[in-house]
Regions:
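Interhelical loop/hinge segments that connect adjacent transmembrane helices in multipass membrane
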Residues: 1-12, 16, 153, 196-237, ...
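Interfacial segments at transmembrane-helix termini and the short loops linking adjacent helices
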Residues: 111-129, 313-345
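Membrane-interface junctions at transmembrane-helix termini in multi-pass inner-membrane proteins
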Residues: 13, 17, 80-83, 134-159, ...
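Helix-loop junctions and terminal segments of transmembrane helices
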Residues: 66-83, 147-148, 258, 262-306, ...
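Hydrophobic alpha-helical transmembrane segments
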Residues: 123-130, 157-204, 217-221, 228, ...
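Helix-terminus/linker motif at the lipid-water interface of multi-pass membrane proteins
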Residues: 35-49, 113-116, 172-174, 233-264, ...
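Signature of the first transmembrane helix
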Residues: 12-69, 97-98, 102-110, 128, ...
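Alpha-helical transmembrane segments of polytopic membrane transporters and translocases
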Residues: 47-67, 132, 239-241, 253-270, ...
């Protein structure tokens, strides 16, 4: 099937069910890899080193927000066929944005050093994350087409390989006392491999083009969609960046360590469902009864898993920290874990509803 060809409702439903199963499996694999690595790194790294790790990724995520004006989401959400002109316009605009942002990131290096007290090693890690942002933007179109067509069997492979390479290299090099440089090496290698693998799985010939009309049509949905996500970026990564300058890397290490564990139920239960339901809901826009049923089922499924998982996590966190000697240093983060847990419960209800409104084009409501 051509990348721009529309698919029927029956195909959408079948691929959506398979997609949820595939992405749930992907999430399970990724979280197992991430958990194993995070557990090992929690014992090997100091809170300050962990803080540098989180702050660097927060900087990268903040820049990544401005590298996207919602064009990929607009391609997924669009009713009807997607044209090659729209694909190439999206590709061209995004590459231009990323190059400008990378230049700003380099210019802002003295600010990162003074505000966070970063060493040269930490700065090199941030630059490596900037390079990974470029590699990620280069694979946006084939990834978007796989997602639009609900071909999640292919879609998940580069993500799993990326995570496996990154965490394996990170843990190995940290164990060998490479410190923060471990992450610099790991992120470059993993992002390059995932870029090449994406184009192997979904060949698409990159090209430079610009259509004002195509860009305008996509921005009608994409820009409000991206503005809508700014609250999430400001709440998570923005807050990390502000608090990092006030509390220092060690203080932010405690807070974000707690948040990562508290958000774990969302990553397992909610993320795979939302990833599939966004394009699926978009394809169901003309069938209200099917759409309503799908929304209700997705919320019920997510809440039935997230609610008990969060409560259980808060209860057992203290005893686990007491049991593992190398984790005693994370005891100050237990209060933050409980507080963030309540936010996780609310997100299990509100995020699927926001996803539904976005998928059906009611972006101004959200």
């Amino acid at each position: 099937m051509a990348p721009t060809e529309e698919i029927s409702l029956q195909v959408v439903k079948k691929r959506a069910v398979r997609g949820i199963a595939t992405l749930t499996g992907r999430t399970f694999i990724l979280q197992i890899i991430s958990l194993a690595a995070f557990a090992l790194l929690g014992g090997l790294l100091t809170p300050e080193q962990m803080g540098v790790y989180f702050l660097a990724f927060a900087i990268k995520n903040f820049f990544a927000y401005f590298a996207d004006i919602g064009l990929a989401a607009a391609l997924i959400q669009k009713r009807g066929e997607v044209t090659e002109k729209e694909l190439r316009t999206t590709f061209t605009v995004q590459q231009g944005q990323v190059i400008i942002l990378l230049a700003i990131m380099v210019v802002a290096t003295p600010l990162f050093k003074s505000w966070y007290g970063f060493s040269d090693t930490s700065i090199h890690f941030i630059w490596a994350l900037g390079a990974s942002l470029l590699f990620s933007s280069l694979r946006t179109i084939p990834s978007t087409l796989m997602e639009r067509e609900l071909k999640f069997g292919r879609f998940v492979i580069p993500q799993i390989v990326d995570a496996l390479i990154f965490y394996t290299l990170s843990v190995t090099l940290v164990f060998l006392n490479f410190g923060i440089t471990s992450f610099t090496i790991a992120v470059i290698v993993s992002s390059l491999v995932s870029l090449m693998l994406t184009y192997v799985l979904y060949p698409w010939i990159p090209g430079i083009a610009f259509s004002k009309d195509s860009l305008k049509r996509l921005l009608n949905f994409g820009l409000p969609y991206q503005v809508n996500t700014f609250l999430a970026v400001a709440k998570d990564d923005g807050m990390t960046l502000v608090l990092g300058g006030i509390l220092g890397p060690a203080g932010i290490g405690y807070i974000v360590w707690a948040k990562k564990w508290a958000d774990l139920p969302l990553r397992f239960a909610m993320d795979p469902v939302n990833k599939v339901t966004f394009p699926a809901f978009s394809r169901m826009q003309n069938n209200i009864s099917e759409l309503s049923s799908a929304v209700n089922k997705s919320i019920l499924y997510i809440c039935s898993l997230v609610f008990p998982a969060v409560i259980g996590l808060i209860i057992i966190a203290g005893p686990i920290i007491e049991t593992i000697p190398s984790y005693k240093k994370w005891e100050p983060a237990l209060i933050a874990l409980a507080l963030v847990g309540f936010n996780t419960v609310w997100a299990a209800v509100s995020t699927p509803l926001t996803n539904f409104l976005n998928a059906t084009g009611r972006i101004s409501v959200t």
